[in-house]
């Protein structure tokens, strides 16, 4: 198309790859659910996102499948967000502040192929 400034589609997966390429050694710092501070680089994050995408593919996940997440903001959820999107699947994030009944309804309605959660949500 004429008039477009970009030469490729703007995809979520390209964001982490751009960061890994142009800011490889910059740190991502977050506090894990368990308490300690977690530090690693954009390069390491991109590698882990690709590994997650490959693992989900080997488990039979296909483009368009829905992958559910119930997690607090942290490095693991970041990796899920970018890893799932990079393989063409849908990252279905759930709000941890919803009631148990609401979460059950939403999970069943979405028909998530896989579901990831932080241990703080496991009874």
Language model: regions and residue ranges:
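Secondary-structure junction/capping motif
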Residues: 10-14, 41, 123
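Structured loop/turn residues at beta-strand edges in well-structured enzyme cores
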Residues: 10, 21, 62, 108-110
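A short N-terminal helical cap/helix-turn-helix that marks the beginning
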Residues: 7-29, 47
């Amino acid at each position: 198309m004429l008039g477009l400034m970009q030469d490729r589609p703007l995809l979520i997966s390209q964001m982490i790859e751009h960061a890994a390429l142009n800011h490889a050694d910059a740190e991502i710092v977050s506090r894990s659910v368990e308490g300690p501070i977690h530090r690693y680089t954009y390069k390491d994050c991109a590698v882990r996102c690709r590994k997650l995408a490959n693992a989900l593919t080997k488990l039979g996940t296909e483009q368009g499948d829905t992958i559910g997440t119930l997690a607090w903001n942290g490095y693991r959820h970041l990796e899920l967000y970018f890893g799932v999107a990079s393989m063409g699947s849908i990252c279905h994030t759930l709000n941890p502040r919803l009631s148990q009944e609401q979460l059950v309804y939403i999970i069943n309605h979405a028909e998530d192929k896989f579901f990831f959660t932080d241990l703080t949500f496991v009874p």
